[in-house]
UniProtKB/Swiss-Prot annotation:
Keywords: Cytoplasm, DNA replication, DNA-binding, DNA-directed DNA polymerase, Nucleotidyltransferase, Transferase. One of its GO terms (biological process) is leading strand elongation. This is DNA polymerase III subunit alpha. Its main location: cytoplasm. The lineage of its organism: Bacteria, Pseudomonadati, Pseudomonadota, Gammaproteobacteria, Enterobacterales. It comes from Escherichia coli (strain K12). Its EC number is 2.7.7.7. DNA polymerase III is a complex, multichain enzyme responsible for most of the replicative synthesis in bacteria. This DNA polymerase also exhibits 3' to 5' exonuclease activity. The alpha chain is the DNA polymerase catalytic subunit. It is tethered to replicating DNA by the beta sliding clamp (dnaN), which confers extremely high processivity to the catalytic subunit, copying a 5.4 kb genome in 11 seconds, a speed of at least 500 nucleotides/second at 30 degrees Celsius. The DNA polymerase III holoenzyme complex contains at least 10 different subunits organized into 3 functionally essential subassemblies: the Pol III core, the beta sliding clamp processivity factor and the clamp-loading complex. The Pol III core (subunits alpha, epsilon and theta) contains the polymerase and the 3'-5' exonuclease proofreading activities. The polymerase is tethered to the template via the dimeric beta sliding clamp processivity factor. InterPro entries: DNA_pol3_alpha_NTPase_dom, DNA_pol3_alpha_thumb_dom, DNA_pol3_finger, DNA_pol_IIIA_C, DnaE2/DnaE/PolC, DNAPol_HHH, NA-bd_OB-fold, NA-bd_OB_tRNA. It is found in: Cytoplasm.
Length: 1160
């Protein structure tokens, strides 16, 4: 093989994020195809792709050279930034490169990105080779300016600190000043004896990728492609040229080519991958192994005392627990993981001791008795048949992985504790990368290409919003996409470009829960990435790479439900303390509570963790779970596999005796499998059951059975053939019929694909049960906590308030004196609306109000509040929202007066603040002392009509709280529905039609699998709710009426809704209130007294009626005197349409009691 003549030493992948188009693997593949012996990837101030690059390089027979490009500043050039490429020659250089990168991020950075000081290179110079940065380096810029003194100073610095390790970089990519710089650099090299090196400053693989790269950069920089201000820093020649092309390009400077090979030979970094390094856990004089044994045995004693309070039963059950504990401890210590368990034990115990709610466990870790004994998990694995080998398999060495759920509010406290315990430089969170996803890349590319918003939006909306959606999947899922792609050249060009950019790394963020703890500094294993302020460090390797690099990942996950449970318990225990009751321990509640299961069987699971979706409620209704094992099964059953395979139907039918229970099949079953499959009525539902079947029938160890389970999941033919043979051989040894064994193997293989991790299912079922129990026993506190968690989502709060009303809970409006930021429960068991849930207010103003209230007591009235609160934080707009929401109802006569007095109150508060500033407290009499003075201080005005009050609540709270728009129609609606309210509805007999009325609170149109359209709306008359279905004919006729907040009168047949357990109506006729009046009203009655009538009133009456003439309803004027009453009927030309506007105008003119519709 001939000696290589060139190696690429400056290449950006997409991990540079500011530029670079290709992923590391394709870059390596291209280099291999070009016959290159080595390749350097030098992303901008990061090694994010290093682990993937290192693995791909060695896999392709290419030496990976570790390096990075930097922005550099030095005093000689002032604020001007220059470029420098740094390569690691050896492991010391790799360490110094890691420190340089980390330091650049930790100092903070601006729009130009992280920057290093050139002086940092003095201390960290060992093992590093520098490429000068070409025309953009400090020497390059000085040469182009002809500043020989500056050139000399720069060169002297590198000669002193990097002798034989500093190369003048030569680039020929057709960009401005490259040739001028190159000639000057060659002259300098000859004059000073400096080596030169050729690079192609690669940004993409092929020259055809240039346009895509330009768009990628424009997306990052926020320009359109045609913008004359857009920087044009790249050329089509920055692709991965072949050795031949580079040799031809630099034929006049052969030493620049030869030096690339020499540098590649000098760069020999070994990155240790695939080993694990844990921090040392403090164990005193004991070994880590012995300390784990000690703590586990002590913990088991406590657990057994709780599980079996009766000593005799405890003695009877102890042997199986002791044996299991011994087995697990042996495996953990043999595999070298005692420290891992102790570390997790410590931060979980610290959390519990410091009021941070922790989940009962999740994932396969719940199968470990050692974890249960150490209080890492809270489920007894023996009681629920959870297997340790599903978590840690001695026959397949891999790190244990506890996913630990913490309360969202306090999770960061735990991470802070870990940082304090092991050292801040030894603890870090993990990076995650955002990529250009299908929907977003269409929008980004469309914007950069200058297409109108509507054009791009139309294409983007055709891409389904499903997680993991790609353009390829979208073309399969949405028929319109290929159609417009073929029909429109502009669409085709946009999508073709989007395909080139899809999946390209766009930005970096923080992994949701991953934390690594190093035995030394994090930077001994991975460089750090920080935010712009130099805070919140994360490793530059993602979660899989950072583990491969030797750091052990701990998952600190935030679970919102734990926060809800915590908030609920705080309110509950506050109440219990007042009543002299001990605090409630949620971990100690019974798992067989009848009240909870009764509520579950009624599908009343709104706000219950994991059980609140429509589909889940349907499953609950069918299954009728009556024990905790059924709840574990619910979590496992509600997945696409079991739902689509018919497994769910079999499970339900077997539970309710409609199908014979067999183990596992009527034709092919074995009695020895009954203990394994009995909890799931003979259905193979869990992965653990797959393992137990292999153990029972064929004598597998549980470790071997876990390998079988994995093989069945991967479905590799050669592996399955091997396992089939092992299974048959084991069954034969156990005396089991060969045909039966193989038939059961086939059944197990079929269901293994649907099997769910029971440990995870059981752990999450426990959290579900805890929320169910709280809802059943402490409904107000639980719902207040749930609404607090959803305060930022008004739509969800509205739905939860509906649920509260359905449950019979009372919700009070927000109150500025008794209210809190969160929803809470008062001493009367009523939920007080959270002030923080008022739209348009924000946390700052509320904090200012509560601070003033805590300092000076309750506010007496509006003027007092404005005077005592910082009006810089509490501006007029915020105060208006608070008034409209009802939060100030106790501060004044009514909302209209409060609103009209707001200007005076703010003015008085301003005067009060000025007076206080010069020591003249209350000089202007702002703070009235007497109630009479307070009343007089408010503007005199009429209260708002109820509808205005309700509209204000709707605007600020998202719902009507103190009233209902239907209230003003109730008397009238009784005429249309025969006095029947929605709460009194019942199923109608076949063929019989009933009429109902209510406010539309939800409306939608859906398309069935057969393509039929169905309209669904929910009516509310404040007594109850009714779901109304409009099938095709009715929908075609009445769809325009299906609008939220409209009053509808609907006639149809009522039946039970199997899904909700409530009632539903199939509509035949739908009317709005105006149409109902036209149909049913016989006249509009206006009653006047002799004292009211004068020419002015009659004139205004005519003006009110005039716009509504040409209707169908006659107008009747009733004239009332002390001694007589007369009726005057207006002529036919004065028939009117009795709209809300007309009725409200007349009632405002004459009086609400004097205007009525007349009916037969």
């Amino acid at each position: 093989m001939s000696e290589p003549r060139f190696v690429h030493l400056r290449v950006h992948s997409d991990y540079s994020m500011i530029d670079g188009l290709a992923k590391t693997a394709p870059l390596v593949k291209k280099a291999a195809a070009l016959g290159m012996p080595a390749l350097a990837i030098t992303d901008f101030t990061n090694l994010c792709g290093l682990v993937k690059f290192y693995g791909a390089g060695h896999g392709a027979g290419i030496k990976p050279i570790v390096g990075a490009d930097f922005n550099v500043q030095c005093d000689l050039l002032g604020d001007e930034l220059t470029h420098l490429t740094v390569l690691a020659a050896n492991n010391t250089g790799y360490q110094n490169l890691t420190l340089l990168i980390s330091k650049a991020y930790q100092r903070g950075y601006g729009a130009a990105g992280p920057i290093i000081d050139r002086d940092w290179l003095i201390e960290l110079n060992e093992g590093l080779i520098l490429l000068s940065g070409g025309r953009m380096g400090d020497v390059g810029r000085s040469l182009l300016r002809g500043n020989s003194a500056l050139v000399d100073e720069c060169v002297a610095f590198y000669e002193e600190h990097f002798p034989d390790r500093y190369f003048l970089e030569l680039i020929r990519t057709g960009r401005p000043d490259e040739e001028s710089y190159l000639h000057a650099a060659v002259e300098l090299a000859e004059a000073r004896g400096l080596p030169v090196v050729a690079t192609n400053d690669v940004r993409f693989i092929d020259s055809s990728d240039f346009d895509a790269h330009e768009i990628r950069v424009a997306i990052h920089d926020g320009f359109t492609l045609d913008d004359p201000k857009r920087p044009r820093n790249y050329s089509p020649q920055q692709y991965m040229r072949s050795e031949e092309e580079m040799c031809e390009l630099f034929a006049d400077i052969p030493e620049a080519l030869a030096n690339t090979v020499e540098i590649a030979k000098r760069c020999n970094v070994t990155v240790r991958l695939g080993e694990y390094f844990l921090p040392q856990f403090p164990t005193g004089d004991m070994s880590t192994e012995d300390y784990l044994v000690k703590r586990a045995k002590e913990g088991l004693e406590e657990r057994l005392a709780f599980l079996f309070p009766d000593e005799e039963e405890r003695l009877k059950r102890r042997p199986e627990y002791d044996e299991r504990l011994e087995t697990e401890l042996q495996v953990i210590n043999q595999m070298g993981f005692p420290g891992y368990f102790l570390i997790v034990m410590e931060f979980i115990q610290w959390s519990k001791d410091n009021g941070v709610p922790v989940g009962p466990g999740r994932g396969s870790g719940a199968g470990s008795l050692v974890a249960y004994a150490l209080k890492i998990t809270d489920l007894d694995p023996l009681e629920f048949d959870l297997l340790f080998e599903r978590f840690l398999n001695p026959e397949r060495v891999s790190m244990p992985d506890f996913d630990v759920d913490f309360c969202m509010e306090k999770r960061d406290q735990v991470i802070e504790h870990v940082a304090d315990m092991y050292g801040r430089d030894a603890v870090s969170q993990i990076i995650t990368f955002g990529t250009m996803a299908a929907k977003a890349v269409i929008r980004d590319v469309g914007r950069v290409l200058g297409h109108p918003y509507g054009f791009v939006d139309r294409i983007s909306k055709l891409i389904p919003p499903d997680p993991g959606m790609t353009l390829a999947k979208a073309f399969e899922a949405e028929p319109q996409l290929p159609e417009i792609y073929e029909a429109d050249e502009e669409v085709k060009a946009l999508i073709d470009m989007a395909r080139k950019l899809e999946g390209v790394t766009r930005n970096a963020g923080k992994h949701a829960g991953g934390v690594v703890i190093a035995p030394t500094k994090i930077t001994d294993f991975a460089p750090l990435y920080c935010d712009e302020e130099g805070k919140h460090p994360v490793t530059q390797f993602d979660k899989s790479d950072v583990e491969y690099a030797g750091l052990v990942k701990f998952d600190f996950l935030g679970l919102r439900t734990l926060t809800i449970i915590n908030w609920a318990l705080e309110m509950i225990n506050k109440r219990r303390a007042k009543n002299g009751e001990p605090p409630l321990d949620i971990a100690a509640i019974p798992l067989d509570d009848k009240k909870s299961f009764d509520m579950l069987q009624r599908s009343e699971t709104t706000a219950v963790f994991q059980l609140e979706s429509r589909g889940m409620k349907d499953l609950i209704k069918r299954l009728q779970p009556d024990c905790f094992e059924d709840m574990i099964a619910l979590v496992a059953l509600f997945r696409p596999g079991p739902l689509q395979s018919g497994m769910v139907d079999n499970f339900i039918d077997r539970k309710h005796g409609r199908e014979e229970i067999s183990y596992p099949d009527v034709q092919w079953q074995h009695e020895s499998l009954k203990p394994v499959l009995e909890p799931t009525y003979g259905i193979i539902l869990y992965q653990e059951q797959v393992m137990q079947i292999a153990q029972v029938l064929s004598g597998y160890t549980l470790g071997g059975a876990d390998m079988l389970r994995r093989a069945m999941g991967k479905k590799k033919p050669e592996e399955m053939a091997k396992q089939r043979s092992v299974f048959a051989e084991g069954a034969e040894k156990n005396g089991i019929n060969a045909e039966l064994a193989m038939k059961i193997f086939d059944l197990v293989e079929k269901f293994a694909g649907y099997g769910f991790n029971k440990s995870h299912s059981a752990a999450y079922a426990l959290v579900s049960y805890q929320t169910l129990w709280l809802k059943a026993h402490y409904p107000a506190e639980f719902m207040a906590a749930v609404m607090t968690a959803d305060m930022d989502n008004t739509e969800k709060v509205v739905g939860l308030v509906d649920e509260c009303w359905r449950m019979g809970l009372k919700i009070l409006p927000p109150d500025i004196n008794s209210g809190l930021y969160h929803f809470h429960v008062n001493d009367d068991g009523e939920i007080v609306y959270g002030i923080g849930a008022i739209k348009g207010v924000g946390e700052g103003p509320i904090e200012a109000i509560i601070e003033a209230r805590n300092k000076g007591g309750y506010f007496r009235e509006l003027f007092d509040l404005c005077a005592r609160t910082d009006t810089k934080k509490l501006n007029r707009r915020v105060l208006e929202k608070l008034i409209m929401s009802g939060a100030f109802d106790r501060l004044g006569p009514h909302r209209a007066a409060l609103m009209n007095s707001l200007g005076d109150a703010l003015k008085a508060a301003d005067q009060h603040a000025k007076a206080e500033a010069i020591g003249q407290a209350d000089m202007f009499g702002v703070l009235a002392e007497e109630p009479e003075q307070i009343e007089q201080s408010y503007a005199s005005c009429q209260p708002w009509p109820e509808q205005v009050v309700l509209d204000g609540e709707r605007e600020t709270l998202g719902l009507y709280l103190t009233g209902h728009p239907i209230n003003q129609y109730l008397k009238e609606i009784e005429r249309y529905v025969g006095g029947v309210r929605l709460k009194d509805m019942h199923p109608t007999e076949r063929g019989k039609v009933i009429t109902a009325a209510g406010l539309v609170v939800a409306a939608r149109v859906m398309v069935t699998k057969r393509g039929n359209r169905i309209g669904i709306c929910t009516l509310d008359d404040r007594s109850g709710r009714l779901e109304v279905m409009l099938f095709t004919d009715a929908l075609d006729k009445y769809q325009q009426l299906l609008e939220k907040d409209r009053i509808l009168i609907v006639s149809g047949q009522v039946s039970f809704d199997d899904f909700s357990g409530g009632l539903k109506m199939t509509a035949r006729e739908v009317m709005d209130i105006d149409e109902a009046r036209e149909k049913y009203a016989r006249g509009l009655a206006i009653s006047l007294t002799d004292r009211q009538i004068d020419d002015q009133l009659l004139n205004r009456l005519r003006q009110s009626l005039e716009p509504h003439r040409s209707g169908t309803i006659p107008v009747h004027l009733y004239y009332q005197r002390a001694d007589a009453r007369a009726r005057l009927r207006f002529g036919a030309t004065w028939r009117v349409s009795p709209s809300d506007r007309l009725l409200n105008d007349l009632r405002g003119l004459i009086g609400s009691e004097q205007v009525e519709l007349e009916f037969d």
